[in-house]
Amino acid sequence: MIVGPVISLLLSYFVLVSGASIEPRAAKSTDQPVDVPYDIDEFTQAASLAQQAYCTKGAHDYGLKIGDSTLLWTTGDGSLKQRVNVHHSESLGIVVAFQGTNSISPFSDFHDIQFRPVDPDARYKQYYPKGTKVMNGFQNAYTDDVDTVFKHVEKFKQEKNETRVTVTGHSLGAAMGLLGSMDIALRMNGGLHKAYLFGLPRVGNPTFANFVDKTIGDKLHWVVNGGDWVPLVPPRPFGYQHPSNYIWIYPSNSDNWRLYPGQENVHGMLTVPQDVGTSDHLGVYFHSKIGGRSGPCPSQLGGF
């Protein structure tokens, strides 16, 4: 979701005002932030794999080591179709990493501006409560890859004698990752181990957000860096809603982070001016740099 910020926001506004609201706006949490109760090293590892999904050079270097992980398989060319990497990690298990927006690909950018709310895809619609809506573009990007990804994840689970499946991604990749996390939890034997999503935009309506909370709960870890504007789109007045419990890094790119309980917490990211560029969206998350196409390739674990 790193198409030129001003262009993206204008297109977002045009698409949204020309359509109907998904459903009335849901409530915001007023709970105070708390210390992050999770293993930070796992965030560092996951962020480095989210960055690697952007990398074209060496994309098929199977056996590539990043931290405690090994690259096993890749699909998608990163332009016409979003890239998805599968790694095996000592700390996270089988890791599915979704590429964020390729800013020089109109096909990738187009996913970010298809804001129309739609029903869940037929593959998994039966598992969702009535009234669930998700953003069309994010779902299209996800369903382009899902069948072959599921097939290979099951294959590598058997080969590695591994039951844990973790999902990571940044920006558009985080949105795909949220849909993927739910899909794995609902349809894959063994379900979801954990999800680490960075710079996550809103993906669905309150019915979706509530079902995410119910289904994967504190297995989901999503992170906002400083004044990043991407987590504020699509806008809430049009019915989109985040799931609970985001982690806010503030100041941006620092090692100061707190967890904000509940959905759409009024504290944290909503209290500071938004960075209209990408310096916070493409930043340092738990010491690993996520810089998109301009980030480290191959990715590096920590060190920032």
From Swiss-Prot:
* GO cellular component terms, A-Z: extracellular region
**Lipid metabolism listed as a keyword:** yes
Q: What is its EC number?
A: 3.1.1.-
- The cysteines covalently paired via disulfide bonds are C55-C297
GO MF terms on file? hydrolase activity
Q: What catalytic activity is recorded?
A: a monoacylglycerol + H2O = glycerol + a fatty acid + H(+); a diacylglycerol + H2O = a monoacylglycerol + a fatty acid + H(+)
Transmembrane spans? none
Residues annotated as signal peptide? 1-19
One of the GO biological process terms: lipid catabolic process
Q: Does the record's keyword annotation contain Protein biosynthesis? A: no
The cellular location(s) given in this protein's UniProt record come to: Secreted; Secreted, Cell wall
Family indicated by similarity: Belongs to the AB hydrolase superfamily. Lipase family. Class 3 subfamily.
What this protein is reported to do is described as: Secreted lipase involved in Dandruff and seborrheic dermatitis (D/SD) probably via lipase-mediated breakdown of sebaceous lipids and release of irritating free fatty acids. Shows activity against monoglyceride and diglyceride substrates, but not triglyceride substrates and does not exhibit regio-selective production of diacylglycerols. Hydrolyzes distearin, dilinolein, dipalmitoylglycerol and dipalmitolein. Cleaves oleic acid from 1,2 isomers of diolein on both the 1 and the 2 position of the glycerol backbone, resulting mainly in free fatty acids but no monoolein is detected.
User: What protein name does the entry list?
Assistant: Secreted mono- and diacylglycerol lipase MDL3
Q: Which organism is it from?
A: Malassezia globosa (strain ATCC MYA-4612 / CBS 7966)
